[in-house]
């Protein structure tokens, strides 16, 4: 998801204070704590030992599991929690996680939270209130240094420094005791956990246990200790006090109690991490495999133009992309191949590789402008035999029942949009992370993910992709008499559409992004 909403991480009732930039304050580097420093970490270490360097993986393919896993990791953590996110939106799910983070800090767990600066727009004081806890540290990545006080000055500041400010930290990482991590496409917010009344994102996360978590810990440290990461209190004229934090906690408790009374079903659904914990069960279901954690260097965002290839996640993934020989399946919520991607995909298809892509349709995407960057490439891709599947808008239950992707219907009748990012190479390896197949992920934003060498795990991810490509869920774009048509299924009957589904406003947004040449920024 692209930025557009604002974060309210803890206390929607707190008042905002004007912020100002201050001089950089010298700070000590900080590293992940040893995985063996806690009982939980040692239990993971003992579980992983027989697998001789392999790590354990389990997909979290539905929103309930994804939320429960995060909440349970906070509860299990004994020494450290490291969170790195592009977007954190206010909502019931976020408030529950914040409450658990505060409880973890109370019992002595060190909590480090690294947020992309766009998350904090206009909310520095609110976010910084959390950091008043002695066990919680919060930093912002690639922050705007001047003009933070109002929305207007922030917009102006980003515009005047656009070459740096459009480059964002898109990473999503959740790490407990340097032993268990969650990677994937989900940010934090109700729309990612099936708790938002207007939109639910269909996504894939992966529970990652053992040595891979330590690799991801190194990734977190690189970003945390980067010169681009600044403590949030550097942007405040005065720091929130312990009393401010206590007031926030009181309001947080009142808010969650109100949710319990007013929306008891949703409250109970999210609280299953307390009533029916699953972590011990999931640990027995892990797939143990060789793997590689991949991430962009934080300094990628400092490049004057295109970054040095040595800094890029895609360079680390290049051997897999080049080496695929039989089947390549890609899931990318935002897909803009550009000329290099077009050459790569058509080249693989021409070499006899079965290439299939699942992305959002125009009617389903939350960013129609990105669809405008994808649409001009469809015909060339289809001419070379690349199979294109565009996920249909999946209406919530208020709009009728029907098939839904990844075995999940929205709890509150919300429409669903694809937000997943994954690749499957020759049914042997799977890559899951925050990376979209578009110029923004390749060149401008930073990303993180894990490549797993396991036919079993690759098979699970492939099954999810094929489910999404089913004609009842997606439009398959095809060529008919030289023109693109969309083949789909309704009520068991196949039919062909000659006009792309989507409202006139979505069409206009897609057309506009193409017309003004935004592709390289998408």
Stretches with model-predicted labels:
Residues 1-8:
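Bacterial N-terminal signal peptides that target proteins for export
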Residues 9-18:
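Bacterial N-terminal signal peptides
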């Amino acid at each position: 998801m692209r930025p557009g909403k604002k974060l309210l991480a803890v206390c929607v009732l707190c008042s905002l204070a004007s912020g100002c930039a201050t001089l950089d304050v010298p700070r000590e580097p900080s590293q992940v704590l040893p995985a063996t420093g806690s009982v939980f970490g040692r239990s993971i270490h003992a579980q992983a030992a027989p697998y001789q360097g392999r790590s354990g993986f389990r997909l979290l393919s539905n929103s309930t599991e994804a939320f429960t896993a995060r909440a349970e990791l906070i509860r299990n953590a004994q020494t450290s929690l490291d969170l790195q996110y592009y977007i954190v939106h206010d909502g019931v799910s976020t408030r529950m996680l914040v409450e658990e983070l505060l409880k973890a800090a109370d019992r002595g767990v060190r909590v480090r939270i690294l947020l992309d600066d766009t998350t904090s727009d206009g909310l520095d004081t609110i976010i910084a209130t959390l950091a008043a806890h002695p066990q919680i540290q919060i930093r912002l990545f690639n922050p705007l240094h001047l003009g933070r006080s109002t929305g207007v000055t922030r917009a102006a500041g980003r515009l005047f420094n656009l070459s740096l400010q459009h480059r964002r930290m898109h990473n999503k990482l959740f790490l407990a005791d340097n032993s268990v991590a969650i990677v994937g496409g989900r940010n934090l917010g109700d729309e990612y956990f099936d708790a938002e009344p207007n939109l639910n994102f269909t996504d894939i996360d992966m529970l990652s246990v053992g040595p891979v978590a330590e690799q991801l810990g190194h990734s977190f440290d690189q970003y945390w200790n980067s010169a681009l990461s600044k403590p949030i209190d550097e942007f405040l004229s005065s720091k929130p006090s312990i009393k401010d934090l206590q007031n926030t906690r009181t309001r947080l408790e009142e808010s969650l109690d109100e949710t319990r009374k007013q929306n008891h079903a949703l409250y109970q659904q999210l609280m299953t991490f307390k009533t029916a914990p699953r972590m011990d069960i999931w640990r027995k279901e892990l797939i143990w495999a060789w793997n590689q954690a991949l991430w962009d260097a934080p300094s990628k965002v400092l490049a004057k133009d295109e970054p040095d290839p040595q800094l890029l996640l895609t360079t680390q993934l290049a051997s897999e992309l080049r080496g695929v020989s039989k089947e390549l399946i890609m899931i990318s919520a935002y897909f803009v191949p550009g000329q290099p991607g077009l050459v790569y995909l058509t080249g693989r298809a021409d070499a006899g590789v079965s290439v299939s892509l699942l992305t959002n349709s125009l009617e389903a995407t939350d960013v129609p402008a990105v669809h405008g960057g994808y649409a001009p490439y469809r015909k060339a891709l289809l001419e070379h035999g690349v199979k294109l599947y565009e996920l249909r808008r999946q209406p919530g239950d208020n709009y009728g029942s029907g098939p839904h992707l990844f075995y999940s219907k929205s709890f509150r009748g919300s429409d669903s949009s694809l937000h997943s990012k994954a690749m499957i190479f020759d049914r042997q390896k799977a890559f899951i992370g925050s990376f979209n197949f578009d110029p923004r992920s390749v060149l401008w934003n930073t990303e993180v993910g894990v490549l797993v060498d396991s036919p079993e795990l690759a098979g699970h991810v492939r099954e999810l992709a094929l489910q999404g490509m089913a004609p009842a869920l997606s439009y398959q774009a095809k060529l008919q008499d030289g023109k693109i048509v969309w083949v789909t299924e309704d009520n068991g009957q196949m039919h062909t559409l000659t006009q792309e589904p989507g409202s006139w406003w979505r069409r206009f947004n897609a057309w506009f992004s193409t017309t003004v040449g935004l592709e390289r920024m998408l």
